[in-house]
A protein has these predicted regions:
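Face-specific signal for non-transmembrane alpha helices
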Residues: 16, 21-23
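Short, charge-rich amphipathic interface segments used for partner binding and complex assembly
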Residues: 24-62
Length: 64
């Protein structure tokens, strides 16, 4: 049970890291540069969140 809780906490930390990566990439960019960087940053964020969702689902199946 404790292992499951630790794994869940690690997934939450990874999710927060994904959001911080997005913010770091887009924050403080000029309008033109933001337009270039934001689609990449959003795509990267969505990719990381999808992977985390899949890992979370696997973790929940194992716990059941």
């Amino acid at each position: 049970m404790a292992e499951s809780r630790d794994a869940h906490e690690l997934l939450l930390i990874e999710e927060a890291d994904a959001w911080f990566e997005y913010l770091e990439a887009t924050r403080g960019q000029g309008e033109v540069r933001y337009g270039e960087v934001e689609p990449w940053a959003w795509s990267r964020l969505r990719q990381r969140l999808r992977a985390l969702k899949a890992r979370r689902a696997r973790l929940e199946r194992q716990a059941a």
